[in-house]
Amino acid sequence: MSGLEPTPEQFAALAARPADAPVVMVNLLKFHPESGLQRYQQYGRDVAPHLERVGATVRYAGGAPSVVIGEGERPWWDAILIVEYPSPQAFIDMVTNQEYLEVHEHRAAALDRGDLISTSSWSIAPE
């Protein structure tokens, strides 16, 4: 089962990434059965100014109703949220800000499970 907070090792690995490269965070979200979605939507509204403050952009947010390739009819997660930050430090600055930590309580209360995957982009265009 996934934790809802990063381990010190996970946080250190993110901080060690190239400082001048954007980082795209893929959130796989499993909501608590009772009011989890509504609480997460409240978190989304409350976190928007914090994302703006660090220059982050929501690239995609949506449900995960079915599996096309893979096992089972549905994935384990209910929704996907993809957010691009201008750098790893921008993400770190946001999540360590005291005002953000107050908003973060809504996220923790909404989720039964939440995997956060830090990715880097690469081109698939032909050379």
What is each of the regions a protein language model found here?
Residues 105-127:
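Charge-dense polyanion-binding interfaces
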Residues 93-99:
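Short amphipathic alpha-helices in soluble, non-transmembrane regions
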Residues 80-83, 99:
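Hydrophobic alpha-helical segments of small multi-pass membrane proteins
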Residues 1-79, 86-93, 120-127:
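Short S/T/G/P-rich N-terminal loop/turn motif that feeds into the first structured element of a domain
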Residues 55-58, 99, 115:
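Secondary-structure boundary/capping signal
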